[in-house]
Swiss-Prot record:
The keyword Transferase belongs to this UniProt entry's keyword annotation: yes
Modified residues (Phosphoserine): S478
Organism listed in the record: Mus musculus
Protein name: 60 kDa lysophospholipase
Active site positions: T19
Gene that this polypeptide is encoded by: Aspg
Amino acid sequence: MARAMGPERRLLAIYTGGTIGMRSEGGVLVPGRGLAAVLKTLHMFHDEEYAQAHSLPEDTLVLPPASPDQRIIYTVLECQPLFDSSDMTITEWVQIAQTIERHYAQYQGFVVIHGTDTMAFAASVLSFMLENLQKPVVLTGAQVPIHALWSDGRENLLGALLMAGQYVIPEVCLFFQNQLFRGNRTTKVDARRFAAFCSPNLPPLATVGADVTINRELVRKACGKSHLVVHSSMEPDVGLLRLYPGIPASLVRTFLQPPLKGVVMETFGSGNGPTKPDLLQELRVAAEQGLIIVNCTHCLQGAVTSDYASGMAMAGAGIVSGFDMTSEAALAKLSYVLGQPGLSLNDRKKLLAKDLRGEMTLPATDVLLQDGMLGCRVAWLLSMNGSQEADTMKDVLLPGLALAAAHAGDLDTLQAFVELDRDLNLKDYSGQTPLHVAARRGHAAVVTMLLQRGADVDARNEDGQSPLLLAVRGRHQSVIGLLRAAGARLSPQELEDVGTELCRLASRGDSEGLRAWWQAGADLGQPDYDGHCALQVAEAAGNADVVALLQSFKDSVCAQPQPH
């Protein structure tokens, strides 16, 4: 990932409809045409003087200067007709993908303006349709129309344009409420609040505040010089089955009938379900007849495992594990895999078990064994000695391998470094150490081992971030505790804008985020730029759970805001 260069960045904004451009007719909201005309009346979206001086077309707008030497110019392409996102299907998403393909050479990035109700589905589907992306595709929308006095649409759309225009993040993303998510990791979690989306099992790719923080190691790398491939042959006959206590086997049998070709089955907890013989038999028969069933947990966070007998029974019935995929991503992936021609049933199941577009987090053992054992490669490299060439190879490769082991939670590989007396404070190009990576990923066992072996608890990467700050942002409470016990403290620079961050978390009702900052030693009474503190923001927003939490932290009482 790199910051986009050049004096002008040209984007295509594809307006499909959605609440952001809706108008009231007869007391209800309906899709509204002419979004470009609305945006031209808002100075934050258009610099008319620059447009006239450069003779820009009527449908092309230009943002005010994002930096002294760069302009973002964007063309608004309005779909005919506009859609309520509840009516969107694979057919419409194929049209969006093909529109991106037709204009791919003309623009450096794309923004898709979409209704929020099915935006997570759209982002997941597009991520599989668009292979070998070299440019950002950012979906966004709003909970309230953009022309309303109090709307989230302005910040969301402006943020999406800036992220697509200023950064080269070659993925299908979703930007909402100051956060850039990987699209196929998102789900809509609130029907009314502005913080409508979350990414349950992957931190945001970027967070916007006083500064823009990019989680560089999470951003997927572009596939070299490969050309964009658009997969428009998606299988529509896939479905979603949510298990519930006492679900009859007869109902499951009826649901699994043709023309259905694939099913995402939402199970309990870590992939568990009823073990009644008649129900398991229906699932087994369907799988033997060629129906592909993917097991996803209906929990918001966590993953499917085989820790319990009922989970093992599901795997024994021929069901494919969806690991930590969202149901939206699993449906999209199933549609994509079933749409690929010439594959056997076994080949399709293998594809479903692979991480194709960053949609799932595979267990560490699966990651390491996909292309061979990482530990064996490290041991071979560490055993090389005697030549200048070997030493050069070690200097180049060892930091990356150490960070890869920390990322995967691979204690055995890291132990190989220790046994051969290698430095575990190796840094990569961005100043990251294995402790940074393990802290961000939440690998408590790896953090423990690294601390015991002398890892620098106060190491800073090139952005001035400590392992403790990364653990806080990942909300990894066990790791925060380990680092604090080892003497880690947040620096004054890391706490400089903490008041604003705490107020943002309080406004969103994010108790887990607030608890992480408190555990790391932050003063939860720190005010934001307006002089308000998190408790006051939570009270004003009516977030009773957050108010109770903040009041339980005895050192988090704040004074009244100072008058302006």
